[in-house]
C-alpha cells in the first residue's frame, strides 16, 4: 500500500517510518508545527525523510495550536517530571491534537492517491491521551470513510496501538531504526532531560526491550525512581 506516515521525529514515529518503508510503499512523511516547545523534533523527522528518500511535508498549524491553550507542550506551563501513568502528565495533553493532524494527513493522502496513513500511537499512551486509544482510531476511520466516500479510500494504520513502547524499540531494532536520530524530550533542551514523562518512558522502554539506549540524558538515573511504583512486562 502507498502509505504516508505521520512523523514527529520521535522514537515511535521514526520507527514506524522504517517499518512502513520495509513492509509497505512509503511515499512520504508528514509532520506538524503546532507551536510545540520541543520543535527540534521536526529536524529529526526531516532527517528520517532524507534517510528514507521520501518527501517531507511540514504543515504549519501553529495558529491553531495557539488556541489550544493550557498544555505544557505549547504554553508557558512547566513540563512535569515523572512517569506517564501519573495524573500530572495530563498537563501535556493538547486537546484534539491527533484528530486535527490526522484529518489533514487524510486530506493529503487523498490528494496524493495514497492508500493509507500510518500513525504511531501505542498502548503506553492510553492512560493520558484519549486520541491514542483504539476507540478513537476505529471512530476516526469510520468518520473518514464517510468524509471521503466516492472520492478516496484511505486506511488508517496504527500497528502499535495495542503494544508497549518497549515492543516498538524491539521492532525498531529489527528494522534498523537509528535510535540516536530520534527526539523524545518534551522540554526541548540539549540533551534529553531524563525527567519528563516521555524521557522516562523512553529510558524504561530500552531497559525492558533489552536494547542499548544510545540517548544522552541530563539526568541518567531519575527514571529508576519514577518507574518504581509501576509494573511493566519485559518483552523479551
From Swiss-Prot:
GO molecular function term, any single one: ligase activity, forming carbon-nitrogen bonds
Chain positions recorded as Zn(2+) binding sites: 185, 193, 196, 199
Keyword RNA-binding appears in the UniProt entry: no
Cofactor binding: number and manner: Binds 1 zinc ion per subunit.
Cofactor list: Zn(2+)
HAMAP family registered for this protein in UniProt: QueC (MF_01633)
NCBIfam families attached to this UniProt entry: 7-cyano-7-deazaguanine synthase QueC (TIGR00364)
This protein's name: 7-cyano-7-deazaguanine synthase
Organism the protein comes from: Rhizobium johnstonii (strain DSM 114642 / LMG 32736 / 3841) (Rhizobium leguminosarum bv. viciae)
Organism classification: Bacteria, Pseudomonadati, Pseudomonadota, Alphaproteobacteria, Hyphomicrobiales
Amino acid at each position: 500500500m502507498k502509505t504516508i506516515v505521520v512523523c514527529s521525529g520521535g522514537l515511535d514515529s521514526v520507527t514506524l517510518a522504517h517499518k512502513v518503508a520495509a513492509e509497505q510503499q512509503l511515499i512520504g512523511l508528514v509532520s506538524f508545527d503546532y507551536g510545540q516547545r520541543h520543535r527540534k523534533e521536526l529536524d529529526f523527522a526531516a532527517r528520517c525523510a532524507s534517510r528514507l528518500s521520501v518527501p517531507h511535508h511540514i504543515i504549519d498549524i501553529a495558529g491553531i495550536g495557539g488556541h489550544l491553550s493550557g498544555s505544557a507542550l505549547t504554553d508557558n506551563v512547566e513540563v512535569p517530571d515523572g512517569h506517564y501513568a501519573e495524573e500530572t502528565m495530563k498537563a501535556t495533553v493538547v486537546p484534539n491534537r491527533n484528530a486535527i493532524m490526522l484529518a489533514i494527513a487524510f486530506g493529503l493522502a487523498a490528494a496524493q492517491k495514497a492508500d493509507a496513513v500510518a500513525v504511531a500511537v501505542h498502548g503506553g499512551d492510553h492512560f493520558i491521551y484519549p486520541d491514542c486509544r483504539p476507540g478513537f482510531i476505529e471512530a476516526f476511520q469510520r468518520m473518514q470513510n464517510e468524509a471521503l466516500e466516492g472520492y478516496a479510500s484511505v486506511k488508517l494504520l496504527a500497528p502499535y496501538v495495542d503494544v508497549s513502547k518497549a515492543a516498538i524499540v524491539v521492532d525498531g531494532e529489527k528494522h534498523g531504526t537509528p535510535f540516536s536520530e530520534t527526539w523524545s524530550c518534551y522540554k526541548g533542551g540539549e540533551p534529553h532531560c531524563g525527567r519528563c514523562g516521555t524521557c522516562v518512558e523512553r529510558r524504561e522502554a530500552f531497559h525492558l526491550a533489552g536494547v542499548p539506549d544510545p540517548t544522552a540524558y541530563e539526568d541518567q538515573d531519575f527514571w529508576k525512581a519514577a518507574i518504581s511504583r509501576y509494573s511493566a512486562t519485559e518483552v523479551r
